[in-house]
Amino acid sequence: MRSYETMYVLSPDLNEEERKGLIERFKNLIVERGGEITNFDEWGKRKLAYPIQKKSEGYYVLMNFNSSPDVSRELERVYRITDGVLRYLIIRTDD
């Protein structure tokens, strides 16, 4: 298993229930495919450096996890097709 770090920015237009649902969906995707979440941190709503999709704020979430490369590819695919995700980044960390 490899170590990864992901940060994603959710739309500020999502209500709390929708936001928590998306966060749980992403966490479950990792765990159900044999991955392990080692760190999870919700940074909350912050101002963006520049507007993204005409929005000036976003809800930031940071997560570290261990998994196979297939899981990170699937997570990226799900980020891409999820409407509430403004931006995301997944990097492999070397421990």
Swiss-Prot record:
<dbReference type="GO" id="GO:0006412">
    <property type="term" value="P:translation"/>
</dbReference>
<keyword id="KW-0699">rRNA-binding</keyword>
<keyword id="KW-0689">Ribosomal protein</keyword>
<dbReference type="InterPro" id="IPR000529">
    <property type="entry name" value="Ribosomal_bS6"/>
</dbReference>
<dbReference type="GO" id="GO:0003735">
    <property type="term" value="F:structural constituent of ribosome"/>
</dbReference>
<keyword id="KW-0687">Ribonucleoprotein</keyword>
<protein>
    <recommendedName>
        <fullName>Small ribosomal subunit protein bS6</fullName>
    </recommendedName>
</protein>
<dbReference type="InterPro" id="IPR020814">
    <property type="entry name" value="Ribosomal_S6_plastid/chlpt"/>
</dbReference>
<comment type="function">
    <text>Binds together with bS18 to 16S ribosomal RNA.</text>
</comment>
<dbReference type="GO" id="GO:0005737">
    <property type="term" value="C:cytoplasm"/>
</dbReference>
<keyword id="KW-0694">RNA-binding</keyword>
<dbReference type="GO" id="GO:0070181">
    <property type="term" value="F:small ribosomal subunit rRNA binding"/>
</dbReference>
<dbReference type="InterPro" id="IPR035980">
    <property type="entry name" value="Ribosomal_bS6_sf"/>
</dbReference>
<dbReference type="Pfam" id="PF01250">
    <property type="entry name" value="Ribosomal_S6"/>
</dbReference>
<comment type="similarity">
    <text>Belongs to the bacterial ribosomal protein bS6 family.</text>
</comment>
<dbReference type="GO" id="GO:1990904">
    <property type="term" value="C:ribonucleoprotein complex"/>
</dbReference>
<dbReference type="InterPro" id="IPR014717">
    <property type="entry name" value="Transl_elong_EF1B/ribsomal_bS6"/>
</dbReference>
<dbReference type="GO" id="GO:0005840">
    <property type="term" value="C:ribosome"/>
</dbReference>
